[in-house]
Amino acid sequence: MIMQDEIQPYDLPDELGHFGPYGGIFVAETLMEPLEELKAAYHRYLKDPEFLAELDHDLNHYVGRPSPIYHAERLSRELGGAQIFFKREDLNHTGAHKVNNTVGQALLAKRMGKRRVIAETGAGQHGVATATVAARLGMECVVYMGAVDVQRQALNVFRMKLLGATVIAVDSGSRTLKDALNEAMRDWVTNVDDTFYIIGTVAGPHPYPAMVRDFQAVIGREARRQMLEMTGRLPDALVACVGGGSNAIGLFHPFVDDREVAMYGVEAAGDGIETGRHSAPLSAGRPGVLHGNRTYLMEDEDGEIIETHSISAGLDYPGVGPEHAWLKDCGRASYVSATDAEALEAFHILTRSEGIIPALESSHAVAYALKLAPTLSSDKIVLVNLSGRGDKDIHTIATREGIVL
């Protein structure tokens, strides 16, 4: 166990991509040079005023940032505890937080002379966000998606195709996000000269976990400023769903040194942690190596990856970003979980109390906020990251509830 004060958060990752014992680079030799090229380009352009100005312009005028903070007064009143606020990432162009990252990585790809971008996707939001920026920049786009997710996220598959992307359904393994990521990595190994891999979460080999975090940290920077303007102080607690964990790290990172602000990451408990049918490696997993980095994983006794389950395609992943693993071990963040049933209940409660239809991923965060807020006094503030909108999930929910559309 790492003590909370041993490592300062802004010193991480180190030059080799480590967050304490997590992260790093565990890839085939053929990918070492492309990763070094990417790291050098990222560090160069992160200090380039022209790149940063273009990024800011696109976030403001294309994505629609800053996303607003919304005080859910009716919901807060009905719960009878802390005041609940939402960071409205669902209002971004494409409907989720994913576009914050794809805009940044696509601009990098353009400057690095790449003509083709590839991506993996689970819920389809990262695929849509990648296809969107590829269309805008005139780049070829290929998206890998597990065959199970292709079925349950048919709307987003059609959106990607409308945007000009080629969507490849992956039939291997559990046919979900893990397998899509495997195939995307294979594509990149084969086509490194002209292809840029836009990873959608804070996982993968260094520099991806840090780079995706830095592009998503606009969420937390804005939220920090907005909460100070609206309430005169910082929130008492942050709540965000965690699959790979990019929306959560995006919110958490600018608050890490504010020790008075509690941080809660909400994993997908699926049918219940005790059933084994879940996607909660921080709650019930152990450290191992997957997709180029060391982190908490869902493994069996032989070190084989266990098949995951969640009603939410975007949380249906057996690993988690290495920075979350470090935040768990050092005690700075707490990781909890919500079941499919709890997420569905939260989906309906938020929809009917505030007129906001959240994504099933975001509904896991809402579910925990519904538990947390009543335990706190009315002068406390809970800020929930509403990472995406729920249009994409309507058919999944209708089918589960026996409704034919």
Swiss-Prot record:
Cofactor(s) of this protein: pyridoxal 5'-phosphate
GO cellular component: cytoplasm
CDD domains: Trp-synth_B (cd06446)
Gene3D superfamilies, alphabetized: 3.40.50.1100
Molecular functions per Gene Ontology: tryptophan synthase activity
Keywords: Amino-acid biosynthesis, Aromatic amino acid biosynthesis, Lyase, Pyridoxal phosphate, Tryptophan biosynthesis
EC numbers on record: 4.2.1.20
InterPro entries recorded: Trp_synth_b_CS, Trp_synth_beta, Trp_synth_beta/beta-like, TrpB-like_PALP, TrpB-like_PALP_sf
Involved pathway(s): Amino-acid biosynthesis; L-tryptophan biosynthesis; L-tryptophan from chorismate: step 5/5
Signal peptide from the UniProt entry: none
Sequence positions bearing N6-(pyridoxal phosphate)lysine: K98
PROSITE patterns: TRP_SYNTHASE_BETA
Catalytic activity line of the entry: (1S,2R)-1-C-(indol-3-yl)glycerol 3-phosphate + L-serine = D-glyceraldehyde 3-phosphate + L-tryptophan + H2O
Similarity comment: Belongs to the TrpB family.
Function: The beta subunit is responsible for the synthesis of L-tryptophan from indole and L-serine.
HAMAP family, per database record: Trp_synth_beta
NCBIfam families: trpB
Subunit organization: Tetramer of two alpha and two beta chains.
The name this protein goes by in its record: Tryptophan synthase beta chain
Native organism: Methylococcus capsulatus (strain ATCC 33009 / NCIMB 11132 / Bath)
Gene: trpB
